[in-house]
């Protein structure tokens, strides 16, 4: 998979791309990442990429021409089979022939909420371009040159770089061979195997810590009983913590007693 990132601050990604699962994916060749700044296509001596908003208002707006030219440059580089950037010493950028045009994603609080289903969809694409905003946001016309808009949630940050890292991390762990145990991704919160439920509680040693014990059923080795317990706990946790997910998965309200408390 190839991921292009349009950002005014490529240096923010250096540490993120060098460590952990993302770093290993780059080193193995499962992932290639290129960052490029729209300032390369900025105007004037200072390479300006923003301007005052028409109609007045506070703040500065990112120019459509600088963003689009940056995206087009990435497409041109992909068409030429240009190798992507990678951490020092990592041979994650080998390319044979033209690379596909990236699916363009605008990172904005006005976008559709980013969910596991979207991560699965993006991870299946050969190439994705993530566009990070700054200042007061984008010129509205940028939206005519992207394929979709994604939001991390109902809050606003100073830029889209953290959102881009979240999208990259969520997608990379779904790539074949990246996660050490592929089964782990199949039985975690929001996974298809759990039908959209939250993951059941997990325990490890010690058996008891300051009065808190590992449930007996997990220590007895009865796999059928453990599976039933985990399913019941996943349902209970979802009903208690995310009734919206319960309604989506079950098509109704979580079971509750007369006081409104969710029942086991």
Swiss-Prot record:
<dbReference type="InterPro" id="IPR016009">
    <property type="entry name" value="tRNA_MeTrfase_TRMD/TRM10"/>
</dbReference>
<feature type="region of interest" description="Disordered">
    <location>
        <begin position="240"/>
        <end position="264"/>
    </location>
</feature>
<feature type="compositionally biased region" description="Basic and acidic residues">
    <location>
        <begin position="240"/>
        <end position="251"/>
    </location>
</feature>
<dbReference type="InterPro" id="IPR002649">
    <property type="entry name" value="tRNA_m1G_MeTrfase_TrmD"/>
</dbReference>
<keyword id="KW-0489">Methyltransferase</keyword>
<dbReference type="Pfam" id="PF01746">
    <property type="entry name" value="tRNA_m1G_MT"/>
</dbReference>
<dbReference type="GO" id="GO:0002939">
    <property type="term" value="P:tRNA N1-guanine methylation"/>
</dbReference>
<dbReference type="InterPro" id="IPR023148">
    <property type="entry name" value="tRNA_m1G_MeTrfase_C_sf"/>
</dbReference>
<keyword id="KW-0963">Cytoplasm</keyword>
<feature type="binding site">
    <location>
        <begin position="152"/>
        <end position="157"/>
    </location>
    <ligand>
        <name>S-adenosyl-L-methionine</name>
    </ligand>
</feature>
<comment type="subunit">
    <text>Homodimer.</text>
</comment>
<comment type="similarity">
    <text>Belongs to the RNA methyltransferase TrmD family.</text>
</comment>
<keyword id="KW-0808">Transferase</keyword>
<protein>
    <recommendedName>
        <fullName>tRNA (guanine-N(1)-)-methyltransferase</fullName>
        <ecNumber>2.1.1.228</ecNumber>
    </recommendedName>
</protein>
<dbReference type="GO" id="GO:0052906">
    <property type="term" value="F:tRNA (guanine(37)-N1)-methyltransferase activity"/>
</dbReference>
<dbReference type="InterPro" id="IPR029028">
    <property type="entry name" value="Alpha/beta_knot_MTases"/>
</dbReference>
<dbReference type="GO" id="GO:0005829">
    <property type="term" value="C:cytosol"/>
</dbReference>
<comment type="function">
    <text>Specifically methylates guanosine-37 in various tRNAs.</text>
</comment>
<keyword id="KW-0819">tRNA processing</keyword>
<feature type="binding site">
    <location>
        <position position="133"/>
    </location>
    <ligand>
        <name>S-adenosyl-L-methionine</name>
    </ligand>
</feature>
<keyword id="KW-0949">S-adenosyl-L-methionine</keyword>
<feature type="compositionally biased region" description="Acidic residues">
    <location>
        <begin position="255"/>
        <end position="264"/>
    </location>
</feature>
<dbReference type="InterPro" id="IPR029026">
    <property type="entry name" value="tRNA_m1G_MTases_N"/>
</dbReference>
């Amino acid at each position: 998979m190839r991921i292009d990132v349009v950002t005014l601050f490529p240096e923010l990604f250096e540490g993120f791309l060098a460590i952990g699962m993302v770093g290993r994916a780059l080193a193995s060749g499962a992932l290639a990442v290129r960052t490029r700044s729209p300032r390369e296509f900025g105007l004037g001596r200072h390479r300006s990429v923003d301007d005052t908003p028409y109609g007045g208002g506070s703040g500065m707006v990112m120019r459509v021409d600088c963003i689009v030219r940056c995206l087009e440059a990435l497409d041109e580089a992909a068409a030429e089979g240009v190798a992507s950037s990678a951490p020092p010493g990592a041979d994650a950028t080998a390319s044979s022939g033209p690379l596909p045009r990236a699916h363009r994603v605008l990172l904005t609080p006005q976008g559709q909420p980013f969910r596991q289903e979207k991560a699965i969809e993006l991870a299946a694409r050969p190439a994705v371009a993530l566009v990070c905003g700054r200042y007061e946001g984008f010129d509205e016309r940028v939206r005519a040159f992207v394929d979709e808009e994604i939001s991390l949630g109902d809050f606003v940050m100073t830029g889209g770089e953290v959102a881009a890292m979240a999208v990259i991390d969520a997608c990379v762990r779904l790539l074949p061979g990246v996660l050490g145990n592929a089964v782990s991704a199949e039985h975690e919160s929001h996974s298809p195997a759990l039908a959209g439920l939250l993951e059941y509680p997990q325990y490890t040693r010690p058996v008891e810590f300051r009065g808190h014990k590992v449930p007996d059923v997990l220590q007895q080795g009865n796999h059928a009983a453990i599976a039933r317990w985990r399913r019941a706990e996943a349902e209970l946790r979802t009903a208690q913590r995310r009734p919206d997910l319960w309604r989506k998965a079950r098509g109704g309200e979580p079971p509750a007693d007369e006081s409104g408390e969710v029942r086991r």
